[in-house]
């Protein structure tokens, strides 16, 4: 379903319950709440070890990987092992128990996958001559780092990103500034499967309605606290 359609569905449900001249919400306001609900629903599935539908994932292809100095690496590469870093920060990936929800990082030509690793694991790996040169990746400070005997200049990543728009707008070797300016975000496919998106629309609308009513109560209470001054004349 297109993002514009999802936002419109939320707005329609919201407007039915909120009878006010101020009931029209901005698309950005709806989108931000929708992201919160989407992340919560997907995280719940992940924690319960349920399969996450492929529709929820996004793939960023043609990620430019650049050579960096050893002191720029979160983990020093082993002997005969090279390391490259993405030129730009990767859009934030959803996490589950401190693990990034990434399906894969792989080459775009041969489809060779890189294994996930972390800083502590790399310390043990570097001391093993049989596994030190194996292709691995990690995310550090939102950058993608790739280790291995031969790390290509271009990689692709498939993951559950917190903000789908940021994933679509990510600058790659396959994109251009002109193309980025021409993206109509409301026409992009919102990465959620059909069953879950219905739930997300309902929850997003309900939570926005609750916020509206809370704000109305706060305004009413503030008005009631204003002292009445009787003038004598």
Briefly describe each language-model feature range.
Residues 1-233:
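Glycine-enriched, solvent-exposed interface loops adjoining structured elements
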């Amino acid at each position: 379903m297109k993002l514009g359609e999802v936002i419109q569905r939320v707005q329609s449900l919201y407007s039915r319950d909120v009878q006010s001249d101020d009931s029209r919400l901005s698309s950005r306001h709806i989108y931000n709440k929708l992201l919160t609900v989407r992340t919560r629903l997907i995280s719940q599935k992940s924690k319960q070890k349920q399969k996450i539908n492929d529709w929820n994932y996004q793939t960023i292809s043609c990620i430019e990987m650049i050579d960096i100095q050893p002191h720029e690496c979160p983990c020093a590469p082993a002997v005969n092992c090279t390391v490259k870093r993405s030129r730009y920060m990767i859009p934030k990936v959803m996490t589950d128990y401190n693990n990034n929800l990434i399906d894969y990082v792989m080459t775009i030509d041969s489809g060779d996958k890189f294994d996930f690793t972390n800083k502590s694991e790399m310390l043990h790996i570097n001391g093993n001559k049989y596994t030190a040169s194996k292709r691995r990746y990690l995310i550090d400070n939102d950058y993608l780092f790739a280790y291995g005997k031969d790390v290509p200049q271009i990689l692709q990543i498939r993951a559950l990103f917190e903000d789908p728009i940021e994933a679509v707008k990510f600058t790659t070797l396959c994109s251009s500034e002109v193309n980025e300016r021409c993206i109509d975000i409301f026409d992009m496919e919102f990465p959620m499967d059909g069953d879950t998106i219905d739930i997300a629309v309902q929850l997003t609308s309900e939570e926005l309605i609750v916020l509206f009513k809370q704000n109305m109560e706060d305004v009413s209470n503030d008005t009631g606290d204003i002292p009445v001054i009787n003038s004598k004349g």
